[in-house]
Amino acid sequence: MTVMVSRIEYIGQIVRGEATVIWILVALVLVAYLILPNPTYRTNVKVPTVRYLGGWMPDLVDRLFFNTKATSVIYDGYKQYKKKAYKVLKADGDLVVLSTRYAEELRQLPASTLNALEATFTDHVGDYTTILTDSHLHTETIQKRLTPAIGRLIPRIISELDHAYEVEFPKCDGKWVAINPYEVFLRLVARVGARIFIGDTLCRDEQWLKASIDYTKNIFVTIALLRPVPGFLQPLVGRVLPSSRSLNHQLAYIKNEFLGPLIEKRREMESSGDPNYEKPDDFLQWMMDLAKTEQESHPHNLAQRLLGITSMAVVHTSAMSLTHILYDLLVMPQWLQPLRDEIQEVNPDWHSTTQAHLIGLKGMDSFLKESQRFNPPGELSFHRVVKHDLTLSDGLFLPKGTHICMAAGPISRDADVMSDPDTFDAFRFVKENRPTSGFVSTGATNMHFGLGRYACPGRFFAAFVMKAILSRFLADYDFRFGPDQKDRPKNMMIGDKIVPNVSTPIFIRKRTTSKPL
């Protein structure tokens, strides 16, 4: 199997090979920053500013350093001001990081006061990643249709994974074969996502899979490359960035060649009056049924919304989490056999997996949560944009336009919140056994999926898919690093975001020491 070249590795090659261009861009940034009256968004919230270099350098330097030193800045701010609020300086604007003591007060506020979609749009440089934020249709569809349907969708998930394992994994009976775990998991999750989100017609079409996966990768690359760019330069850089330009072409291709015709065909069938026609039972159809306005119902908007939710909220994040988990097991192999024992006890017949079986994997659930605690998707969570001037209960004034968030990473590593926080204890949440101990649970001390009514709605579906994938992989395969890889591959930091190393190969071999599932 050919291992695909990582887009993140490609980013590194660009940076190393274009040093002269980068220095020219840095010079242009400095000149523009000095001559423009308002080069980036600044908030006038009266809270301390936490800097990487202290207060003796211009703001611009701290903003540029944020992309590589965000973790240090955020943890330092939390250490000093965890009961208060503080400000950090990003290349494209200021973030006000609030204490968890505001959590209950803020989580109940409506979107007209604190807007999560606008914050997500900003955080994911939405002007250049084709993200739609003009309605909550996708969130409503997940909450009203997808999550309640998970129980009856599990057989479809297992069926698609069974096919995916056959076509995506190399033959490795009695021999070690190299794979790129991120790439393999990405394709597994993409196949499952396609089965549930667009149904049987397209889900195994290789052109669809390639187009949707490339779209996912280009979103991630665009975000990674644009985050360190000052906001006033993003319109220039974003329009010439190859990954951003590719996104627009890919989006048009997917709309015109796949989803647009599929939507139109379904509408024709529905309006034909054929008594034998049954609506497809998939996410696309649910969105079509729940759309209330002409704009929401437009085929291109439906297609774009579906691509956004599958690409970033399901496929990419799940593949990253699974890669983290594999690396954790490789450097902490003492947890592997207990997980295998649990799988054999709770879910011995993988092909007959039910929702109850996956819920019963308590040890695996705890492992997922502990892996996320050490390798969260980001150090910051609960992103919101303040839509009108807001004064909090203690008098803190947040002007309209302020981008707020909370320090999810430091909170989950705080000794006041978590006992022995620097020790990886795979089953700590089984022993803890609290209402917030589940992988998908959220709370003021557990915000990696967000908090409140706009916490990640797709986390329930993603968790079941990850458990289904892991149940078979851990039971059927042995795995190890290559001979030159001794330690866990270092995570890559992109601002406050954390991603696994996606270019490290591992070696797998079909297990013969126990009965495969």
From Swiss-Prot:
> In what way does this protein cross or attach to the membrane?
Single-pass membrane protein
* UniProt cross-references to Pfam families, sorted A to Z: p450
Provide the transmembrane region boundaries. Answer: 17-37
A single GO BP annotation from the record?
mycotoxin biosynthetic process
Report the EC number(s), separated by commas if there are several: 1.-.-.-
**Phenotype of the disrupted gene, per the record:** Abolishes the production of penitrems A, B, D, E, and F as well as of 13-desoxypaxilline, but accumulates the early pathway intermediate paspaline.
Pathway listed for it is: Secondary metabolite biosynthesis
Q: What residue stretch is flagged as signal peptide?
A: none
Cite the InterPro entries for this sequence: Cyt_P450 (IPR001128), Cyt_P450_E_grp-IV (IPR002403), Cyt_P450_sf (IPR036396)
What coarse category fits the chief subcellular location reported for this protein? Answer: membrane
This protein's cofactor list reads:
heme
The superkingdom of the source organism is Eukaryota
Which amino acids does the record list as binding heme?
456
Supply one GO molecular-function term. oxidoreductase activity, acting on paired donors, with incorporation or reduction of molecular oxygen
Q: Name one GO cellular component term.
A: membrane
Q: Where in the cell is it found?
A: Membrane
Q: Which UniProt keywords apply?
A: Glycoprotein, Iron, Membrane, Metal-binding, Monooxygenase, Oxidoreductase, Transmembrane, Transmembrane helix
The entry sums up its family as follows:
Belongs to the cytochrome P450 family.
Write the protein's name. Cytochrome P450 monooxygenase penP
Tell me the gene name: penP
